[in-house]
Amino acid sequence: MSQPEKSKKASRPTPTIEDYLMTMHVMERDFGEIVAARLAELMGVAPATVTMTLRRMGRDKWITGQSRREIHLTETGRDAAHSVIRRHMLTEWLLVKIFKLPIFETHDEAHHIEHAISPKLEERMIEILDNPKLCPHGNPFPGHEDLTKDW
């Protein structure tokens, strides 16, 4: 089963929750842990907003643990994070290759578009873009982190 097909089995999170999941995945990958205070900084929101959102995410089974340092993505949360990251990176490639945007402009533009991409469109983007493994900035797609582990 392809990644987009796997991702569509669970109900899709809201764009706000997708943003949290994406940021939490990056924190876990880069820092080894998800810390609520750091999450508030990265998301640009008040700590109280993060606390409320984490409660909702726990209720909806995107994460486990809601204490300040015991936050972990569930398998469903990780799959959803990978999905939005993949859609974001595919959109960046589309903006570079098709729309000829400079790479430094693609991140913000992709962020506006990533939440609207359906699994069907994601499959088509993967096909058209020849199944990329790295984004235009050189970051690995989820599942391809081994490509950059020695950098």
Language model features: what each stretch is:
Residues A48, F104:
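Key DNA-contact positions within bacterial/archaeal DNA-binding proteins
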Residues R69-H88:
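Basic, amphipathic "hinge/linker" alpha-helix immediately C-terminal to the N-terminal HTH DNA-binding motif
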Residues E114-W151:
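C-terminal regulatory/oligomerization modules of transcriptional regulators
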